[in-house]
Design a protein with these regions (language model features):
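Interfacial helix-loop-helix hairpins and adjacent transmembrane helices
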Residues: 1-23, 321, 369-405
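Transmembrane helices with small-residue packing motifs
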Residues: 19-20, 24-52, 74, 347-352, ...
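Helix-loop junctions and hydrophobic alpha-helical segments within the transmembrane domains
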Residues: 309-336
Length: 405
């Protein structure tokens, strides 16, 4: 096996520019594939197409329509004041008129119910069109609100501080309708953004509105991840650089592993983009962090072995060939075991777990290929130097002999 890797090492040294240009070409192809990445944070994206939960949900939608709501919880000292009721009505109307998938509104200012009177039955609104300003009129509205059990403690809290504004949504279109490539916004996220835009208006501040519902939570999740991901990746890169500086004490030993990690991530995500594989934003960081950890480990092994051989021989190209020969199989074995372990995620019947399995295992194998090709190719550049006579005479360094013992 080592002889086979030695031949690969000689090929890399002879065609180092081919290796580097090939890596750059694959990296460019990966970057291009990123434009086709499909981010889908819908809860339905967690299930496989034949999952019983998803099938039952589709049956429900076929009968009742969309099961998602855009909801707002208001929180004020007293809901039953003229000013607050007017704001709730205005908020309800704006949500119904402005949101793309609005269907039916339910709020304290929109509910009608039947009451008995001398003439039989009549249908009245809890909050009349002309909201009274006097205490008696407002007290009557409060009495009516708590008269019906399906309103009391469900739509309005006992103390009158909180109330729900619920907007039922029309069915969201299929992915083939809204997805037009990079920049396409899923209907869930669009609904969440529209709701956020409405409740953040200054005029609704007295209500202290809080957005609720899966579409709103999905959009907030995307915003949070978009804000935190650069921070986490920046911290990961910084820590990687610190570790590499201490481990390699070389510019190439720092730059190449970082490029390896970024390259494997871009290539694997680009491949998933070409395949139009749906990606959950909450899972995107896992393959990235793993790729950095694996890239640092593999490249430190390769670089450290090369440095010892280079000090022993003084011949840069010979040191590269020996490095690929001796380190190719151990690193490959490590990569294959990690690859096989990560593929076990495919046995879990959840789409995000499949993404983790495919993305992480692909990143590991790409990291291996880059570590045993690009790193040696980069290390082969430079001048030879006089071998270290002490290491040459001893046949290796102090640590080498200790490890062999």
């Amino acid at each position: 096996i080592n002889s086979w890797f030695a031949l690969r090492g000689e090929w890399i040294v002879k065609r180092r520019w081919v290796v580097i240009i090939g890596f750059i070409a694959l990296l460019a192809a990966g970057f291009y594939g990123l434009r086709f990445m499909k981010i889908n944070d819908s809860w339905e994206s967690y299930f496989l197409e034949d999952d019983p939960v998803l099938l039952k949900t589709e049956e429900f939608k076929a009968v009742f329509g969309n099961d998602n709501y855009a909801a707002v919880m208001t929180d004020c000292d007293n809901t039953f004041t003229k000013e607050n009721l007017e704001l709730i009505r205005e908020l309800s109307n704006e949500m119904l008129d402005s949101m793309s998938y609005a269907d039916k509104m339910t709020s304290i200012t929109d509910i009608e119910f039947m009451i008995g009177n001398e003439e039989g039955m009549s249908i009245e609104q809890i909050v009349p069109e002309e909201i009274p300003a006097d205490e008696a009129g407002l007290a009557e509205i409060r009495r009516k609100a708590f008269l019906k059990p399906y309103i009391a403690n469900r739509l309005v809290s006992k103390d009158g501080r909180n109330t729900w504004v619920l907007l039922k949504l029309r069915p969201f279109p299929d992915d083939s309708v809204w997805y037009k490539g990079k920049g396409s916004v899923p209907p869930e996220n669009l609904t969440g953004r529209e709701l956020e835009h409405i409740i953040r208006k200054d005029k609704y501040k007295p209500l202290n509105p809080k957005g609720m519902g899966l579409p709103y939570i999905t959009d907030q999740k995307m915003k949070w991840i978009g804000k935190e991901m650069p921070r986490i990746m920046g911290l990961a890169i910084l820590l990687a650089i610190v570790v590499l500086i201490f481990a390699t004490r070389s510019l190439r030993g720092v730059v190449v592993p970082v490029v390896t990690a970024i390259g494997s991530i871009v290539m694997s995500y680009g491949m998933l983009g070409y395949l139009r594989f749906s990606i959950d934003s909450g899972m995107m960081l896992i393959p990235m962090l793993l790729a950095f950890a694996v890239a640092i480990a593999y490249n430190i092994h390769v670089h450290s072995f090369f440095r010892r051989r280079f000090r022993m021989y003084g011949n840069r190209r010979q040191a590269v060939v020996d490095t690929v020969s001796e380190m190719g199989w151990p690193v490959l074995f490590s990569a294959l075991t990690t690859f096989a372990a990560l593929l076990s995620f495919l046995t879990i019947p959840a789409t995000p777990m499949h993404f983790i399995g495919i993305a992480t295992s692909t990143s590991v194998m790409l990291t291996f290929l880059i570590a045993v090709t690009v790193m040696p190719a980069v290390l082969s550049f430079g001048k030879d130097r006089q071998p270290d006579p002490k290491i040459q005479a001893a046949g290796g360094g102090w640590l080498d002999h200790r490890l062999e013992a």
